[in-house]
């Protein structure tokens, strides 16, 4: 595992492990590619992300890693409604009313990546204080 290798080469290093954000609830999960399987829908992707984050958090708490690994919970700080790519679309052919629809529910927008960076930076600063 890469964590073991880093710790072996740099035994005094602290390692921050960043979780992943939840998918966009406004759609867009499969708009950019042809996904199939349990992860191609919003619910399936959300459950997968939650399980993956739980795995990372529990890994960091193991006796083997707890002294030098810290899990950073991005999902708690990421705005899933407004930090993915979206476009405004008419709600139907007879109405001029528009709604925001996700066009990529997996990869954040530039603002979303900046928000992830901000959360990582805050967690990293806090980790280095201790």
Regions found by a protein language model. Give the residues of each.
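Solvent-exposed, polar/charged alpha-helical surfaces in well-ordered, non-transmembrane soluble domains
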Residues: 1-4, 8, 50, 54, ...
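A short helix->loop->beta-strand "cap" motif at the edges of active sites that frequently abuts
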Residues: 10-14
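Mobile gating loops/cap/lid regions near enzyme active sites that modulate substrate access
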Residues: 22, 34-37, 69, 74-104
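Substrate-gating cap/lid alpha-helix
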Residues: 25-75, 110-111
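Histidine-centered active-site loop/cap adjacent to the catalytic His
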Residues: 93-130
């Amino acid at each position: 595992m890469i964590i073991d290798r880093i710790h072996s080469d740099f035994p005094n290093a602290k390692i921050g492990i960043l979780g992943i954000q939840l998918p966009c609830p406004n759609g867009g999960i499969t708009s950019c590619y042809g996904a199939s399987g349990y992860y191609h829908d919003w619910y399936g992707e959300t459950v997968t992300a939650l399980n993956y984050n739980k795995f990372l958090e529990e890994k960091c708490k193991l006796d083997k890693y707890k002294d030098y690994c810290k899990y950073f919970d991005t999902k708690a700080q990421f705005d899933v409604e407004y930090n993915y790519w979206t476009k405004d679309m008419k709600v139907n052919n007879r109405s001029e009313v528009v709604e925001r629809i996700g066009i990529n529910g997996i990869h954040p927008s530039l603002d979303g990546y900046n928000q992830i960076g901000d959360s990582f930076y805050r967690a990293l600063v806090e980790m280095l204080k201790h």
